[in-house]
Amino acid sequence: MAQRYDEMLHYPTLDGMPLAGFGDAHTGRALQHHSLSQSAPYGSTGAGHRVPMPPGMGSNDGLKREKDEIYGHPLFPLLALVFEKCELATCSPRDNSGSFPGGDVCSSDSFNEDIAVFAKQVRTEKPLFSSNPELDSLMIQAIQVLRFHLLELEKVHDLCDNFCHRYITCLKGKMPIDLVIDDRDGSSKSDLEDFTGSCTSLSDQNNSWLRDHDETGSAHSGTPGPSSGGLASQSGDNSSEQGDCMDNSVASPSTGDDDDLDRDKKRNKKRGIFPKVATNIMRAWLFQHLSHPYPSEEQKKQLAQDTGLTILQVNNWFINARRRIVQPMIDQSNRTGQGGAPYSPDGQNMGGYVMDGQQHMGIRPPGFQGIPGDYTAAPSTMPMGFPPAGYTPAIPPHSAGLRHGPSLHSYLPGHPHHASMILPAGASPHHLVSAQSPADALLNGQNIDIHAH
């Protein structure tokens, strides 16, 4: 044992520091500055600052004698044992079973048992201490220091085990992808069939709902509903609806309310698909508020209660719906020439679509044929003068299939058709200043300004 530890380089302080310094605090601090070549042999306990011996004269003999005294001390086997336990605690993997070195073999509890066994064995053979009290104090302090290191290493291992356990538990509870992998192990084929069937049924149901909504809107306003291009974009967009739902489900955090849902809703959420009832409710709200498809916070809360989803899921669904459903309808309307102005969130112009069951600005009801509608003095209605008798529009109306008048932007000052929309038929713009009737002046003074509000 002594030869083994003599060859190891784990004790640089023991080789470079005389043992007599551990009995006196002042002596210990003073001797820490001496190098290996200046070490003095082991001496008496009452000495002060030791005078180092000249190099090469008895230094090797003194070091060897000090090492022999340390290796021959009764407590040295216990010191070597706790040192090995500290090494095992830092270089070996942890295992609670203790089936290999590095498990509970290097724990502090096992070291307590080793101390008891060692003390029992040593007392029967020889005393625990030697005749040198300074060496005894050195051995006891070294064992205590290593004991403290072992306790701290055990605390670090406990913290690591606790963190790993909590991290794995958090991953299992927060990530639905783990649940999807578990489901695929047993029923991957059935899940794929259910997913395909739900996509097909959702697409068919959405198309039928759109047709019913189209017929209802046409009967109410006397105008056709969305064009075939809009329906094509609707049905073509249903295939991407499932991907949006999956993104929303993964992005939304799970809450404790999931425990109160039934098994079917849990299964649907595991696969990232919203229930059909929830999708239909949000889609119905979207088409009822096409003029302003931005639900307020209260409306989001109400929709979340009606659909059984979270507010974040409802919000994400409407973001995707505005991008994938509303925007293609607007683009199709602009391409086919049904709307004179691009879409704005306030619903200033949506082409030939009827929104919220009210007449659109561009649709002409029975009444004056030269103006875009029979506006009344409502708080949201803008003032407008009436043209003189015999006035006919200078721009021919649209085809009978569309049946809506020119855009309101034609009545704004600066528009290319502004002068022709104000002047009577057959008049030219250069007659505007020289030949104005009172009715023309009234009409010119009360042009519509939709940007005033």
UniProtKB/Swiss-Prot annotation:
Residues 218-242 have a biased composition (Polar residues). GO terms for molecular function: DNA binding; DNA-binding transcription activator activity, RNA polymerase II-specific. One of its GO terms (biological process) is anterior/posterior pattern specification. PROSITE patterns: HOMEOBOX_2. Gene3D superfamilies: Homeodomain-like (1.10.10.60). Keywords: Activator, Developmental protein, Differentiation, DNA-binding, Homeobox, Neurogenesis, Nucleus, Transcription, Transcription regulation. Pfam families: Homeobox_KN, Meis_PKNOX_N. Residues 267-329 bind DNA. Its main location: nucleus. In early-mid neurula stages, expressed in a single stripe in the neural plate. By neurula/early-tailbud stages, expression is localized to rhombomeres r2, r3 and r4 and the anterior spinal cord. Some ventral expression was also detected in posterior rhombomeres. Not expressed in rhombomere r1. It is found in: Nucleus. Residues 37-60, 206-272 are annotated as: Disordered. SUPFAM superfamilies: Homeodomain-like. InterPro entries: HD, Homeodomain-like_sf, KN_HD, PKNOX/Meis_N, TALE_homeobox. GO terms for cellular component: cytoplasm; nucleus. Residues 102-185 form the MEIS N-terminal domain. Belongs to the TALE/MEIS homeobox family. Caudalizing protein which is required to pattern the anterior/posterior (A/P) axis during central nervous system (CNS) formation. Inhibits anterior neural expression and acts as a transcriptional activator to induce posterior neural gene expression. Maintains a proper A/P balance required for hindbrain formation by activating the FGF/MAPK pathway, which modulates the planar cell polarity (PCP) pathway. Interacts with retinoid signaling during hindbrain patterning. PANTHER family: HOMEOBOX PROTEIN TRANSCRIPTION FACTORS. This is Homeobox protein meis3-A. It comes from Xenopus laevis. The lineage of its organism: Eukaryota, Metazoa, Chordata, Craniata, Vertebrata.
